[in-house]
Amino acid sequence: MTVLRRGVRLGIDVGKARVGVARTDPDGLLAVPIETVARDAQSVTRIVAIAEEYSAMEILVGLPISLSGADTASTADARTFAGELATASGLPVRLVDERLSTVSAHAALRQSGRSQKKSRSIVDQVAAVVLLQQALDVERHSGNPAGWVVPPGQEPA
């Protein structure tokens, strides 16, 4: 097993109405939900404030791609949001494959006995936890950070 880089990471699940935010502990052992941020003109500013509050070393943004690996309707939106975060935060921002993270989040919430209506406010946070945990697992097993770095000031390809 490879030792992870030390430091808090934020996980971001970008949606049209809400953005789920999760974080790791400094040792990268555990991902936990933080909050659901309304998707509006202030969402990037709020996430940057959260990153500062937790002294995050990097931000991981879920990239919604289809099971076949093709872009989805939400892929360009996530890339644009990641670019805005990279510019505003000055932190490394990485796009990570989030296939099935929201499906896994819904399943976990159903198994915990929550109705879909009650889950709506936290499903984005849980999806952020899932994508962050997957990224930690990739780094732990490969020795390399998951995903692709987003250059600040540019929308990634």
Question: Which role does the model predict for each range below?
Answer:
Residues M1-I12, K16-A157:
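Phosphate- and other anionic-substrate recognition elements at nucleic-acid/protein interfaces
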